Amino acid sequence: WASQVSENRPVCKAVIQGKQLEGLVDTGADVSIIALNQWPKNWPKQKTVTGLVGIVTASEVYQSTEILHCLGPHNQESTVQPMITSIPLNLWGRDLLQQWGAEITMTATLYSPMSQKIMTKMGYIPGKGLGKNEDGIKVPIEAKINHGREGTGYPF
């Protein structure tokens, strides 16, 4: 999973206890928060004494009484004990993002915006290598000056 910063919010899917949920990737949140209207009624939760503080303070806050099994966007195994409150969408916080191996990469603009757009459309993910398993070369190959003409086929 990769997402460039744009007008669209970075969302991804996770599977918690077999239930697929979509959430906003939120590196500013210490813990993951599930929207109350998406929390299954049969999953246990308890009211917390501590509130959630962010831009707005949430008043009715719950936490899962159990540590839940979770699969990240690339089936990364993880566990989470999320908070639950009335928010418009789920938030994947650093508690999950760290387990998923999330990275924030700010690449230097070595290439024109047009060439970057073309590469992205072709499936290139910034910070990953090229190739089927994204494990190929991650940085451009640098040309090396060969002053001795060795290996060029030039007669000495």
From Swiss-Prot:
PANTHER family: GAG RETROVIRAL POLYPROTEIN, RT1 CLASS I, LOCUS CE15. It comes from Homo sapiens (Human). This is Endogenous retrovirus group K member 18 Pro protein. Residues 111-156 form the G-patch domain. The keyword DNA repair does not apply. Autoproteolytically processed at the N-terminus. Expected C-terminal autoprocessing not detected. The sequence shown is that of the processed Pro protein. SMART domains: G_patch (SM00443). Belongs to the peptidase A2 family. HERV class-II K(HML-2) subfamily. Residues 21-96 form the Peptidase A2 domain.
